[in-house]
């Protein structure tokens, strides 16, 4: 059904297209994808390899580059798991909206509730890990658990970022956040606080298609380079800045 002579372009993997579509192609930039599989990735002009496969290095959608990527297999799948405990399928959006509103009033650290997010073990980093919810008291309710899940995922990705920073010899200073989870103000703010850097939300949270479109545009000479394409197709809609008091709390939790 495709028209004759229509160019067919191989764009790259989904997360690699997300990295390009987010505008993460310079030294010191990283992109978090809060999807079913949660990832943090950078673009590197130099090939790096983790011998234990703690993270994977994929061919980038950007010419002459690579994408080191650390992932949590059960990322925002845990939000779906949470919803299944408290709502029917049709009520998921209503429950998430309610949780995002109530979680705004919960302090960093979720009043001592901690979620270890490895419902599926990480084969290299934590091969024997199992998910855990720690610190429960009669004070906690579902919004505490919701926020603790988001915090636990961000802690785990920060763990992976440290490994990538060391191997690629770069310090990340600029963070883009994409995927369905980026629609949550609570998720965006705690990400800025846990990583202690501005977290940028893009106008379009599903940037995989944008990255693929950029690859197609490059192939038919629509753009001079990736930078021009990103400038024309990707916009930052809001930046969340770290809150000093929250950063101190999260640093204490992460380091201990």
Stretches found by the model and what they are:
Residues 2, 12-29:
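Conserved phosphate-binding catalytic cores of ATP/NTP-utilizing and phosphoryl-transfer enzymes
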Residues 32:
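Conserved active-site beta-strand element of glycosyltransferases/polysaccharide synthases
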Residues 7, 19-21, 28, 101-103, ...:
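Generic recognition of flexible, low-complexity loop/linker segments
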Residues 42-55, 59-256:
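Glycine/Thr-rich phosphate-binding loops that ligate phosphate moieties of nucleotide
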Residues 17-20, 38-42, 115:
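Short beta-strand scaffold segments in enzyme catalytic cores
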Residues 8-18, 207, 212:
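Alpha-helical transmembrane segments that form the membrane-embedded catalytic/substrate-binding core
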Residues 2-11, 201:
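Short loop-beta-helix segment that forms the pyridoxal 5′-phosphate
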């Amino acid at each position: 059904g495709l028209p004759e002579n229509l160019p067919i372009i191989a764009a790259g993997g989904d997360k690699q297209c997300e990295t390009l579509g987010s505008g993460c192609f310079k030294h010191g930039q990283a992109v978090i994808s809060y999807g079913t599989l949660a990832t943090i990735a950078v673009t590197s002009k130099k090939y790096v390899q983790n011998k234990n496969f703690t993270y994977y290095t994929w061919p980038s959608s950007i010419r002459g580059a690579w994408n080191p990527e650390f992932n949590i297999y059960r990322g925002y799948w845990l939000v779906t798991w949470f919803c299944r405990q408290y709502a029917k399928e049709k009520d998921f959006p209503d429950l998430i909206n309610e949780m995002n509103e109530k979680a705004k009033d919960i302090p960093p650290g979720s009043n001592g509730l901690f979620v270890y997010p490895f419902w599926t073990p990480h084969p290299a980093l934590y091969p024997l890990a199992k998910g855990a919810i720690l610190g429960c008291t009669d004070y906690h309710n579902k919004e505490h658990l919701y926020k603790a899940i988001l915090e636990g995922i961000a802690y785990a990705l920060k763990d992976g970022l440290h490994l990538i920073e060391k191997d690629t010899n770069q310090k990340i200073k600029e963070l883009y956040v994409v995927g369905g989870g980026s629609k949550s103000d609570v998720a965006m703010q705690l990400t800025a606080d846990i990583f202690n850097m501005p977290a940028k939300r893009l106008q379009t949270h599903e940037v995989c298609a944008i990255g693929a479109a950029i690859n197609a545009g490059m192939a038919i000479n629509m753009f001079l380079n990736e930078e021009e394409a990103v400038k024309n197709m990707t916009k930052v809609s809001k930046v969340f800045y770290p809150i000093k008091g929250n950063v101190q709390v999260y640093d204490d939790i992460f380091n201990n």
